[in-house]
Amino acid sequence: MQLIKCLVIIQLSLLLVEESFAGRDFYKILNVKKNANTNEVKKAYRRLAKELHPDKNKDDPDASTKFQDLGAAYEVLSNPDKRKTYDRCGEECLKKEGMMDHGGDPFSSFFGDFGFHFGGDGQQQDAPRGADIVMDLYVSLEELYSGNFVEIVRNKPVTKPASGTRKCNCRQEMVTRNLGPGRFQMIQQTVCDECPNVKLVNEERTLEIEVEQGMVDGQETRFVAEGEPHIDGEPGDLIVRVQQMPHPRFLRKNDDLYTNVTISLQDALVGFSMEIKHLDGHLVPVTREKVTWPGARIRKKGEGMPNFENNNLTGNLYITFDVEFPKKDLTEEDKEALKKILDQSSINRIYNGL
């Protein structure tokens, strides 16, 4: 009897836990693990937003619902406070505590107000268009190696209704003027329509710029309609151009990395073991058991940069060695001992090495 009572209590407890976690599984919606960091959450949302956008899935009657679920999942899992509450007791707790406000628009933060095109006709070619804005984004080599999200806040001019009307859609038309009996003149004049008046107002906008693994210096990301506005047409685009900052230890050439290591003369002669700290913190072991001459270069396969088109492919790391000679003078006894060890005659070869 006591055993049955315990089982009933356990069953009721499980039901209460299940009830407290009622609601959507945001981790499943975003397809991320429960220990996923913020950048992994952002990356998952950005990828899935392209796949699940209703404009790309017009034949799916549930497309809008799926897209809304995706946005809700991102809003919760990208916010530390909301995520902590969600992990504790699910979506119902968020609703009870008023934390599901649905006020955000993550899609526009990642892709701009006008999103992106899915291969359609896009904007009309003849429509007037505002100027593009080019913005340089300075990033570290570490960010280009591992990937990152950079949040930028900018004042974007947007059109708002204003009182009165204005001339719009102005164009040149041919008009016939009567100059008298049997005399006419064709002239060209500007003809405009009357449109509701508008004004430009600066609004603060936040954009999430993804620095993707393997991006190269000068590579551009385009945000449609985030550029200069045009009162009679469409806004231009915002073009974010990656500018790679110099790195103190590594030089990048395409997908390969180059670095220099200075070793002692002793290590150059007898060999050595060391580790090089890579861009993401992992250690690259380097071992030499033979003589290393000044300017010697070795290759570490697969320790370069990830390829932008295919992150499964990586370049190589090339290590060039410099040898530091001792500063102190040797005694005559040391010199003689060294000559015996090296057993090498003088080589005074003169040549043009340039």
Curated annotation (Swiss-Prot):
Q: Does the keyword Mitochondrion apply?
A: no
- Annotated InterPro entries: DnaJ-B11-like, DnaJ_C, DnaJ_domain, DnaJ_domain_CS, HSP40/DnaJ_pept-bd, J_dom_sf
Q: Decide whether keyword Lipoprotein is in the record.
A: no
Highest taxon above the source species: Eukaryota
- Identify the keywords attached in UniProt to this record, alphabetized: Cell adhesion, Cell membrane, Glycoprotein, Membrane, Nucleus, Secreted, Signal
Name its cellular compartments.
Nucleus; Cell membrane; Secreted
Name assigned to this protein: DnaJ homolog shv
**Additional remarks:** The name 'shriveled' derives from the shrinking testes phenotype of mutants.
GO terms for biological process, alphabetical = cell adhesion; germ-line stem-cell niche homeostasis; male germ-line stem cell population maintenance; positive regulation of integrin-mediated signaling pathway; positive regulation of synapse maturation; protein folding; protein maturation
A GO molecular function term, named singly, is: integrin binding
Concerning Gene3D superfamilies, the annotation shows: DnaJ domain, Urease metallochaperone UreE, N-terminal domain
Organism classification, top ranks?
Eukaryota, Metazoa, Ecdysozoa, Arthropoda, Hexapoda
The role this protein plays is: Maintains stem cell niche architecture in the testes. Activates an extracellular integrin beta-PS pathway which regulates DE-cadherin (shg) levels in somatic hub cells, and is essential for maintaining the number of germline stem cells and the structure and localization of hub cells.
The residue ranges of the J domain are: 25-90
Question: What is the documented disruption phenotype for this protein?
Answer: Males are sterile and display an age-dependent decrease in testes size resulting from a gradual loss in somatic hub cell structure and a decrease in the number of germline stem cells. Hub cells frequently do not localize to the apical tip and are instead present throughout the testes. The number of hub cells is not affected. Reduced DE-cadherin levels in the hub cells. Absence of integrin clustering and decreased focal adhesion kinase (FAK) phosphorylation at the hub/cyst stem cell interface.
Pfam families referenced in this protein's UniProt entry, alphabetically: DnaJ (PF00226), DnaJ_C (PF01556)
Main location class? nucleus
UniProt organism field: Drosophila melanogaster
**Which residues lie in coiled coils?**
none
An example Gene Ontology CC term for this record: extracellular space
> Which range is the signal sequence, renumbered to this chain?
1-22
The organs and tissues expressing this protein are described as: In the testes, detected at low levels in somatic hub cells, cyst stem cells and the apical tip (at protein level). Levels in the testes decrease with age (at protein level). Expressed at low levels in hub cells, cyst stem cells and germline stem cells, and at high levels in spermatocytes and cyst cells.
* Glycosites: 260, 312
